[in-house]
Each structure stands twice: as C-alpha cells, then as structure tokens.
C-alpha cells in the first residue's frame, strides 16, 4: 500500500517535536511499542536490526550502533515519493544539529538539494577525521518497525500511521566495512534525533529502550523501543524483573569536539569503580576509571560495534594476570595453551567444564557506583570458543588489549574500558533515558532462558 504524500510543513514538524518532548504527561501512547530482531552477522560480528522506510515501506537492514546520534541510510538507491529535505537556517535545522549547509545541488534525488541541512553518516568502521569525510542531506520521511504488545504478540509495521522521522542520507561508499545487505545505521545514542528520542517525542512513548543480544549463531535477539516492559522471553519470563541499576554518565567531550568547542558524546558511559576476579579486587589505576572532563578520556563505554571488551593496557594486564592465577587454582585447575588471535589467554576446550551458563571459569565482576551493584560476567560472556578445522579447539578469554590510551579522534580521548557485544550477549540491558540509568541483568542463561528465546511470530497488520 502506497503511503500518502508527506505534506507536513517542516516548521510545524519542529514545533510538533518540541511540544511533545516537553509534554509532562505520557499516559496516552499512540500504538504499541517497537521491536526488532537483532541478527548477528557471522563474518563481521556486527549486530543488525530491521526497519521499514520509504513511502512504500521497504524492509531495511541497519547496523545497530548504540552510541550513534541518528539513523542514516544509503540514499543512492533510495526510492521514495514522500521524503523532504530540511532547509538551512530554520529552527528545525538548529534542533537537528546540522553540520553544514548544502548549496546549489539541483538534481532531483535525496542526496541533492539547494540550501539544505547536511549530517554526517556515522560508520564506525571507517576512520574519523581522515580528511576525506562526507556529509549528506538530512531527510524527513516515513520510518517504522515491528510492534509488540504486553502479551508479547508481534504486529507488522503500520501502513496507516507510520512514523515521520528525521535521518541522514549517505552514499554507497559509506557502506564500506558494513555487513552484507546492510544499507545504513540505526543510532540509539544520546541525541535529540536518535530512534528512542524521536519515537518518544512523536508517540508519547516512555523514553526507554532495551537490548537483548543473542549468543546464538542462528537465532536473533531483540531490541525494544518505547516500553518499560514487560519483556516476555522463553518460559514467559519477564526480563525487566529483577534488574540492577547504575547511572548513565555523560562524557562532556565527544568525538566531534575541538579545542575551542566541546560537544558532549552521544555514547553511553557507566561508572565502573573496580573489577574483581573470582571475588578478589584487581589493583588498578583508579584515575583511568573516571572520565577526564578536559579531554573525555577514561571511564567505561558501552558499544555494540566492538565485538569484544577492550581494556586499556595496564587494566588488561592486571585483569588477565588475575584471571590466569584464579583459573590455575582449585576448583578450576586450568593451564593455558597457545593463544589464538586476537586473544592472549586460552585453555584447551577438553579441560573446561560447562554448565547452562557457559564454561566454568572464574567470575569477573564489574563493580559500579556502589559495592552492591555488580555486573557479573560468567563464562558464557568472559570466554570465546575457537574451534579451527583440523586445528585448535580452545576457550579464550574474550577481552583484548586496547593499548595505552588510544585515540579515536584528534581532540577527544578514548575510554579506558569499552564493554563489547560478546560481553552483552544474553544479558538484558534497559536504557532508561528519563532517569538516565542503565538496568542490567547479568547473564539470563542462569535463569533458564536466553535472548534468542523471544518469539518473533508471524506478522500481522
């Protein structure tokens, strides 16, 4: 079914967003919250969500980028009759935070316009500040996802009342490094035009989203937007209960900062204050665990585009040494073997016992803002199975050395810890953007369920 032509004046659209964002009452919502399967691409280890875009909704695969500011899509192949550009020097231009203004491009296509706002397609697998950055027009167009009700029933993307979303165009060359079939990115970060914030503004959804990345090679996990729960997984277990909570911290220096202009990061940080291995605290340089307000370095970031947790060199050395020592002691009694890249600590698989929570290994505890708030990393998340055909079959500690304060941009420093996708798998994460806190479960495998157990039944509607 073709969508009606988008005729909403852009200035009105801005005030519509602004009014809804400031409305205190959220009792009335418009339609059920959003849900998407999260597929893991085996070759790139990237996580992929599904959305529906354009005037005649097309299923679109997007990279799940937890820290990105907004959606972007390859517009070289974008065929929609309903899109609109955002004019420069308007209130909406300021609200969106456009990078610049595109002038004198008069071809009739989404990637071209005269005096229109442009954004930067954010591809985390292409280097930033390379001197060859591309910008592309911002668009307003239809965007939808699957929906889910409180019983867990799945509905199809609505053709009668789709979302009107702001996002960025991109070009084919911006897809370099992305998984096959992916045509853009789904940004969930701290931004006025991220998916959860736009969905909340338009439809009065609570400013919540949740991720449950699957540890299965074949079955997807699930992403939820606009609901506090319940989140019904296998055996009808609601993963919103119980959760531990820790504040989401703002890094005041984002990757697009300059010496004379600091822009806050769109990425999510949490306050890890110590690390324990097998119940014993690891000696760390505490200054590395805090965010430096001057250059944004340090602290702990969450990332869905990093496959394995990255630790600053001194932290990595301390944690791995403590882990090897604990694994060598009773009741584990394990001896390391030749490592397999990119890991440095591995054990013969034949010597490792397994439970439903994964291989039996020393627990790694990330202690948050209070000593009783702990993200416990068990064997299913601390270890990675590497079985080479005709070669090694080992369990490896799934953490990597990030170097000594590496830089991702010219002016902003890197975090000391980046919690990667593998460590999040089969952990339920709820992002409460109203109270700016993270709810987390630790591994749900110990509860007899998994992130792959959410049922994406036949679509309706």
Language-model-derived ranges and their functions:
Residues 3-8, 20, 24, 43-46, ...:
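Aspartic protease catalytic domain
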Residues 16-33:
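N-terminal signal peptide
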Residues 30-35, 117-128, 194, 255-257, ...:
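Short Pro/Gly-enriched beta-strand edge/turn motifs at strand-loop
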Residues 87-88, 199-200, 454-459:
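Extended Gly/Ser/Thr-rich low-complexity repeat segments
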Residues 128-137, 141-267, 301, 366, ...:
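Glycine-rich flap/beta-hairpin and adjacent strands of clan AA aspartyl proteases
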């Amino acid at each position: 079914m073709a969508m009606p032509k988008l005729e909403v004046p852009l200035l009105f659209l801005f005030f519509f967003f602004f009014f809804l964002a400031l409305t205190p009452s959220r009792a009335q919502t418009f339609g059920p919250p959003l849900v998407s399967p999260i597929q893991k691409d085996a070759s790139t280890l990237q996580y992929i969500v599904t959305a529906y875009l354009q005037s005649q909704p097309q299923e679109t695969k997007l990279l799940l980028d937890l820290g990105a500011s907004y959606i972007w899509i390859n517009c070289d192949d974008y065929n929609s009759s309903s899109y609109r550009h955002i004019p420069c020097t308007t209130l909406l231009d300021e609200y969106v935070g456009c990078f610049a203004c595109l002038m004198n491009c008069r071809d009739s296509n989404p990637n071209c316009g005269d005096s229109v706002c442009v954004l930067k397609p954010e591809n985390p697998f292409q280097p930033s500040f390379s001197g060859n950055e591309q910008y592309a027009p911002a668009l307003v167009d239809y965007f939808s996802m699957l929906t889910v009700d409180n019983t867990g029933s799945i509905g199809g993307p609505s053709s009668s009342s789709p979302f009107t979303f702001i996002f960025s165009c991109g070009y084919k060359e911006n897809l370099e490094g992305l998984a096959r079939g992916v045509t853009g990115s789904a940004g969930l970060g701290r931004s006025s035009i991220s998916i959860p914030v736009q969905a909340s503004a338009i439809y009065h959804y609570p400013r919540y989203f949740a991720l449950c990345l699957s540890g299965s090679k074949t079955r997807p996990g699930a992403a939820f937007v606009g609901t506090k729960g319940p989140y019904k997984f296998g055996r009808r277990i609601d993963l919103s209960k119980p959760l531990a909570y820790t504040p989401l911290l703002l890094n005041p220096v984002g990757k697009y900062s300059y010496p004379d202009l600091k822009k806050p990061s769109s990425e999510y940080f949490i306050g890890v204050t110590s690390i324990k291995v097998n119940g014993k605290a690891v000696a760390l340089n505490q200054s590395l665990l805090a965010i430096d307000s001057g250059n944004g370095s340090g602290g702990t970031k969450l990332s869905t585009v990093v496959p394995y947790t990255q630790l600053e060199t001194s932290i990595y050395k301390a944690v791995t040494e403590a882990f090897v020592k604990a694994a060598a002691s009773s009741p584990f009694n394990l001896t390391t073997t030749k490592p397999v890249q990119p890991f440095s600590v591995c054990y013969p698989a034949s010597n490792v016992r397994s439970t439903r929570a994964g291989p039996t290994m020393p627990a790694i505890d990330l202690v948050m803002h209070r000593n009783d708030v702990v993200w416990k990393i068990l064997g299913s998340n601390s270890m990675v199975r590497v079985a080479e055909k005709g070669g090694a079959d080992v369990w490896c500690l799934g953490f990597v050395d990030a170097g000594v304060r590496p830089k991702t941009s010219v002016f902003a420093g890197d975090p000391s810890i980046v919690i990667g996708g593998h460590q999040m798998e089969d952990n339920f994460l709820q992002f409460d953007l109203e109270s700016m806190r993270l709810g987390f479960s630790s591994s749900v495998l110990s509860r007899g369920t998994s992130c792959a157990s959410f049922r994406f039944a036949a679509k309706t509607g």
